Amino acid sequence: MYPVDLHMHTVASTHAYSTLSDYIAQAKQKGIKLFAITDHGPDMEDAPHHWHFINMRIWPRVVDGVGILRGIEANIKNVDGEIDCSGKMFDSLDLIIAGFHEPVFAPHDKATNTQAMIATIASGNVHIISHPGNPKYEIDVKAVAEAAAKHQVALEINNSSFLHSRKGSEDNCRAVAAAVRDAGGWVALGSDSHTAFSMGEFEECLKILDAVDFPPERILNVSPRRLLNFLESRGMAPIAEFADL
């Protein structure tokens, strides 16, 4: 069990079923020390309003010994790497994930998908690319992994991709993990929980990493401090309340 989960959704994304309090309770039971709530960006049909993300600044940092990161799973909007996160939203958020979602950016050819993903990586606005192994969006995996390593952006291995969504992701995710390994980049593990009961579940992710002998020192979820060091290296100010996690 890794003590950090970086991708989950609450009832604010109406196709998910748990509250912030539900996740805190599960984190305590499962030994999760730090997690990020990453509801969908506002361009998705059932996503929260942009004020939802701005108002995350009122959240407590730590509840019952569990640290809470304020995040978003933004949508890649176009080949220029624009995402549906801007202005005051950036000021309130600790963690910005971005990925392809069909209602916002339909699948294109390999070159177009790759251009959009690399532009997003190079924008400086995101920390993690979500489910880059989605088989509906063919990409140049090597080029994406090299860009991600260059710009200190992690590529996600998403546990839900092997269980509930994005069927047929296994081969692509092995290729992503191997390319990140070779490029010297970072991998982030995400449960992509839409109910609190699955938070912290990375069993399928770990099968992928084991298959390519991925170095554990390049996995962000190994400890809260590793993840926080990564975010601070990207410009996040140290969060005093997280010092003892």
Curated annotation (Swiss-Prot):
Identification of the protein by name: Probable phosphatase YcdX
Keyword terms of this UniProt record: Hydrolase, Metal-binding, Zinc
PANTHER family: PHOSPHATASE YCDX-RELATED
Molecular function per GO: phosphatase activity; zinc ion binding
Similarity remark: Belongs to the PHP family.
Residues holding Zn(2+) 2: H15, H40, H194
Gene Ontology biological process terms, A to Z: bacterial-type flagellum-dependent swarming motility
Source organism of this protein record: Shigella dysenteriae serotype 1 (strain Sd197)
Gene label: ycdX
Matches recorded under CDD domains: PHP_HisPPase_Ycdx_like (cd07437)
Positions with a binding annotation for Zn(2+) 3: E73, H101, H131
NCBIfam families (UniProt xref): PRK09248.1
The protein's enzyme class: hydrolase
Quaternary data: Homotrimer.
A GO-annotated cellular component: cytosol
